[in-house]
Amino acid sequence: MDETGLNGDNLVLAKAVNRIGDSVREAVETSMKDERLKADLITNVSHDLKTPLTSIINYVDLIKRERVDNPKVQEYIEVLDTKSQRLKQLTEDLLEASKISSGNIVLHMERINLVELLNQTLGEFSEKFEQKGLISVVNAPSQAVYVLADSRRSYRVMENLFNNIYKYALEGTRIYIDLGFTEWKSADGSGSQAGVFLSLKNISAMELNVAPEELTERFIRGDESRTTEGSGLGLSIAKNLTEAMNGMFEISIDGDLFKVVLVFPKMDDVKPQTEV
């Protein structure tokens, strides 16, 4: 606030307002600096872990190919394999979350067939779902449905959502998967536009004592006892990536029913671009 020409109480008030403004500005700058430092630290640590972790995974793979007769040693190898793969996933999740929060993520937007991506992901998870007796009930068009998105990041979103189902769905239940067309508000709020939605519903194996919006916060898990393996980053990454690609991501909970809905603009209603 310009203090020129002010005096008395007005000058005192102006100085107070300016001090508050300066304090807020300093706090914001400090917070942004802390966030950058935090993001840089996570990125550097993740990169530093990557090389030795890759070596461990490769050596475990070589050991698994050897003839090992001792059952106890075989058990140790399996545990080592599982834990190293989990650490690899956690490292990748941390790196992805860091890129998103720091704004260092580069998106390669292109024409994506969402039906094809859904079928591909379903095929890759079919064996895992069978192990838990999970039955997929799919309602999707047989023809191609196109959206504008980043291919690799779209798969990451889908993979995270299906991983979440695999970890937390009640065994022997159905998973309802719907893909279709809808109307939704445009990004600038100026009106509605044609969109493509993907809805995933499953029954949770445990009570969901958490608000839907909290499930997309980092390191928050529906399994408070942490008896299942996970980083607590999967849904957060899925939401942030979806929104970075101009999509909508929404979670709803009704008792033990968990539902997530994604919406993307139809390809006809968006202008193609190569990078963001």
Question: What is the predicted function of each stretch?
Answer:
Residues 102-107, 146-149:
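Conserved micro-motifs of the catalytic ATP-binding
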Residues 108-112, 130, 135-145, 182:
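Conserved catalytic submotifs in the C-terminal HATPase_c
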Residues 108-122:
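A conserved beta-strand-to-alpha-helix junction within the catalytic ATP-binding
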Residues 164-166:
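Short helix-loop "hinge" at the ATP-lid/N-box region of the Bergerat-fold HATPase_c
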Residues 172-193:
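Short beta-strand/loop element within the Bergerat-fold HATPase_c
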Residues 207-221:
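Short conserved segment of the HATPase_c
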Residues 246-254, 259:
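Glycine-rich ATP-binding loops of the HATPase_c
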